[in-house]
UniProtKB/Swiss-Prot annotation:
Protein name: Nucleoporin SEH1
Signal peptide stretch: none
Function: Probable component of the nuclear pore complex (NPC) which is involved in the trafficking of macromolecules between the cytoplasm and nucleus.
WD repeats mapped onto the chain: 18-57, 63-104, 111-152, 161-209, 226-267, 290-329
Subcellular location as annotated: Nucleus, Nuclear pore complex; Lysosome membrane
Entry's Gene Ontology BP terms: cellular response to amino acid starvation; mRNA transport; positive regulation of TORC1 signaling; protein transport
Coiled-coil portions: none
Gene Ontology molecular function: any one: structural molecule activity
Lineage, opening ranks: Eukaryota, Metazoa, Ecdysozoa, Nematoda, Chromadorea
InterPro entries according to UniProt: Sec13/Seh1_fam, WD40/YVTN_repeat-like_dom_sf, WD40_repeat_dom_sf, WD40_rpt
Family: Belongs to the WD repeat SEC13 family.
Subunit structure and binding partners: Component of the nuclear pore complex (NPC). Probably part of the GATOR complex.
Protein's organism: Caenorhabditis briggsae
Superkingdom of origin organism: Eukaryota
GO cellular component term of the entry, any: lysosomal membrane
Length: 366
């Protein structure tokens, strides 16, 4: 690295192209070595990072009967599993399997197998989120009717069986995003956001607490967030303090909140949740990260020290936490900053016009 180059300077990799329509979601696996993308062309693509930093597409197939809104990775502890949700009102669980080719038994190739279709939603599924691994293989989803549904795989080695274990009515308007808290020290929380423009400011974020003694999720009424704009995304920090969570919310700008955890919500050393009453939480907004009121998606890094947002104007902004509740802008990059070479443009156009996609909608492998 040259002396005049900032250690935090962002340099884009080569353009990757696979979809014929608008890309709705880009998701990295927990190790950052694999990437999944989905788009309005009803397809999903899997990418593997190469040693030189470029991305090689390893799979691309038609996965739904409508536009695909989200694709997410489960923790690698459960295998190479991704989930996708779509405008066709379904959630599909996919699992990668390594098989031997028929021509050469020594040669191996990967195949993505459709394990199951969850089709009990009565409306479009807008977001999905896997639970942290210490809670097992569970999945939360939300839909346009304001409902949150939680599914669980009773056997973590069998991704083909999922049971609906909870259904929560978060809003009477559209749900747009859902996320889990990641702390092992506290009772699990689920935060839900509404991107409905007609919703009131105090009716855009709802947080539920899991009380193990009652085996149910209960709404925390003491947490009422008055947000100025529809909620397009929200995420808990992967690192929690002993007595607090940190929650980032994209509502025009990026709002960062500290949620104070009462002693009754802190789990015992053996992980047992003894009290059965609802804990009394409190919160404080500790930072407002300006994004020209266009924040769309937000993510934390692995240690919770950097927040990155993507905006409606095609700009990616990152902020770094320097001290307690102090954030400074780390970088800003626009899609127009990268100009693909003629060779890259030719490869993308060629792939879009000549490629035939394998469809897995008519076949299920077990």
């Amino acid at each position: 690295m040259s002396a005049d180059k900032s250690p935090y300077q962002i340099e884009p990799y080569k353009t990757v192209g696979a979809h014929r329509d608008l890309i709705h979601c880009v998701s990295f696996d927990p190790h950052g070595r694999r990437m999944a993308t989905c788009a309005s062309d009803m397809t999903m693509a899997i990418w593997d990072r190469q040693p030189d930093g470029n991305w090689r597409r390893s799979a691309h197939w038609k996965c739904h009967g409508g536009a695909v809104w989200r694709v997410i990775w489960a923790h690698p502890e459960f295998g190479q599993i991704v989930a996708s949700c779509s405008y066709d009102r379904t959630i599909v669980i996919w699992e990668e399997q390594i098989v031997r080719t028929e021509k050469d038994l020594k040669c191996k190739e990967s195949q993505w197998i459709r394990r199951t279709i969850i089709s009990d939603n009565r409306s479009d599924v807008t977001d999905i989120c896997f639970s942290p691994r210490h809670l097992g293989l569970s999945l939360a989803s939300c839909n346009v009717l304001g409902a949150v549904r939680i599914y669980e795989a009773p056997d973590v080695v069998d991704a083909s069986r999922w049971n609906l274990i909870h259904e929560l009515q978060a809003f009477h308007t559209r749900c747009g995003c859902v996320t889990w808290s990641l702390s092992r020290m506290h009772r699990p929380l689920i935060a839900v956001g509404s991107d409905e423009k007609k919703a009131g400011g105090k009716e855009r974020v709802v947080i539920y607490e899991n009380i193990d003694g009652l085996r149910k999720w209960q709404r925390i009424h003491s947490l009422v967030f008055d947000m100025p704009c529809p909620i397009t995304d929200l995420k808990f920090s992967p690192i929690s303090m002993v007595d607090s969570h940190q929650l980032a919310i994209a509502s025009g700008d990026v709002h960062v909140f500290n949620i104070k955890v009462p002693r009754t919500a802190i789990l015992e050393e053996d992980g047992v949740d003894n009290p059965i009453h609802l804990a009394d939480y409190s919160f404080q907004r500790v930072a407002l990260l300006g994004d020209q009121r266009k924040a769309w998606r937000i993510r934390y890094n692995l240690i919770g020290s950097v927040i990155t947002s993507t905006s409606l104007d095609g700009t990616l902004r990152s902020w770094k936490s320097l001290f307690v509740n102090q954030w400074v802008k780390l970088s800003e990059m626009n899609v127009d900053d990268y100009v693909p070479t003629a060779d890259e443009v030719h490869k993308i156009v060629e792939a879009k016009t000549t490629e035939r996609l394998p469809s897995q909608l008519d076949k299920v492998y077990f």
